[in-house]
Structure formats: structure tokens, C-alpha cells
């Protein structure tokens, strides 16, 4: 599959690398065509890179791995025409570090980033997932022992099915994937971040995750 990963940070690079390893044709998008991180990644892993629009245009599926506070601007740069009809996997979190750590979490208007993007791009099929864990666990759930879960939120059932298949290819068993319902449920997933950040500070590692007891706990 042709997949665009928008964002050149650690999350974007981790997801793009995993997708290449699974045989996908991956393009990394950034604000400028000559982004050094994107060029380095493409040279090391065999993907391509360009602007947000360059990456999104030919893609069959788009991953938003930009920071949640700038995701709308990034997707606007990618272009509505380049997103129309496509599944957009939103893994972002709106984190404001202006007052230090832990950051403030969430958009000023109380919506989730996923809802903001869906409203801005109504012909795009937005699915929220993977934002409740560190990037290494996203693509290698076996790093965390025992039962733990990944969440899905979205208004389009077909789009969620596509994303569930992608998660399965990352190693997420079907009984570990919890569909929270429509896209309004993404608010709950994004608001897990304050708790995640506190636990990260206490544990000193990101190798942990949330699990719902009673859902596949014996798997």
C-alpha cells in the first residue's frame, strides 16, 4: 500500500520504518521538501520524502504523526484534494509544553484533534488510534508483557476496519483492539495522556500501556 506519514519526529519515523519493513511504499511528509530528518530517514530505510502535499497526493492511506497543536495546519498544507476519500490515521496528541513538564493536554476548545481534523476535512475518513502509548509499543506491542489494549475511534466503520488490519500487522491481536465508537470518543483517548505522562515520570520508561480487565485478559 502507498502510505504517507506526515511528521518527521520520533513517532513519525518509528511508524514509517515499521511500515517499510512490512512492505509498504512509504513517503514521509514535512513542511519543506528538503527536511533533513526526512531525507536522512529516506536514505536509511528506502522510503521517499517531500512536502506534506508531495507525500499525501499519491498515498492510499495517510498517517498524521505531527504534533496535535499544529496538525490542522499540516493537513491544510497537505491539501484537502490530496486527502479526499482517504483513511487518515491520527496518532497525534495536543501537548503544550510552554509551561514545562508535564504539558497541558488538549485543544483550547475541548475537542479532540481527530474531531478538529474531521470537521476541517469532511470527505476524509479520520480514525484515532495509537496515541495512548509510546512509539515503540505502537509498532511492537510485545514489549509490554501481559494484557494491554489499543483503542480505535471513528465515524466510518470501513475506515476503522482498514486501520484494525494495519494494527494487526503491527502485532496487535484482535482481542487487544477496542473500538470505542464514533469519533467523539477520541476525546477520552486523548485525555488519557495526563495519566500516561504521570506514569512515565514515575516509572522512568515508556514501556507500559493501559489494559482493560476482562477483555481478552486470558490471551
How would you describe each model-predicted region?
Residues 1-40, 44:
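NAD(P)+-binding Rossmann beta1-loop-alpha1 motif at the extreme N-terminus of oxidoreductases
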Residues 14, 18, 120, 166:
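Rossmann-fold NAD(P)-dependent oxidoreductase module
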Residues 44-87, 92-101:
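Rossmann-like NAD(P)-binding element
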Residues 49, 125-129, 176-180:
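General beta-strand structural signal in soluble alpha/beta enzymes
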Residues 102-110, 140-158:
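Short beta-strand and adjoining strand-loop segment in the mid-core
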Residues 108-132, 139-140:
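Short, glycine-/small-residue-rich phosphate/pyrophosphate-handling segment
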Residues 137, 148-219:
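Active-site-lining helix/loop region of Rossmann-like oxidoreductase modules
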Amino acid at each position: 500500500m502507498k502510505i504517507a506519514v506526515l511528521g518527521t519526529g520520533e513517532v513519525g519515523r518509528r511508524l514509517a520504518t515499521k511500515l517499510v519493513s512490512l512492505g509498504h511504499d512509504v513517503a514521509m511528509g514535512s513542511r519543506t521538501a528538503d527536511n533533513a530528518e526526512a531525507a536522512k530517514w529516506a536514505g536509511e530505510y528506502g522510503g521517499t520524502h517531500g512536502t506534506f502535499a508531495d507525500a499525501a497526493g499519491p498515498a492510499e492511506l495517510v498517517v498524521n504523526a505531527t504534533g496535535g497543536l499544529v496538525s490542522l495546519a499540516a493537513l491544510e498544507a497537505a491539501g484537502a484534494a490530496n486527502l479526499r476519500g482517504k483513511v487518515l490515521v491520527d496518532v497525534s496528541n495536543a501537548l503544550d509544553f510552554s509551561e514545562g513538564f508535564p504539558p497541558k493536554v488538549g485543544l483550547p476548545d475541548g475537542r479532540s484533534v481527530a474531531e478538529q481534523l474531521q470537521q476541517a476535512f469532511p470527505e476524509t475518513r479520520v480514525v484515532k488510534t495509537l496515541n495512548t502509548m509510546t512509539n515503540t509499543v505502537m509498532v511492537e506491542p510485545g514489549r509490554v508483557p501481559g494484557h494491554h489494549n489499543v483503542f480505535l475511534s471513528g465515524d466510518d466503520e470501513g475506515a476503522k476496519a482498514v486501520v484494525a488490519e494495519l494494527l494487526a500487522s503491527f502485532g496487535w491481536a484482535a482481542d487487544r483492539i477496542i473500538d470505542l465508537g464514533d469519533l467523539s470518543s477520541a476525546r477520552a483517548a486523548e485525555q488519557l495522556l495526563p495519566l500516561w505522562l504521570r506514569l512515565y515520570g514515575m516509572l522512568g520508561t515508556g514501556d507500559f500501556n493501559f489494559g482493560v480487565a476482562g477483555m481478552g485478559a486470558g490471551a
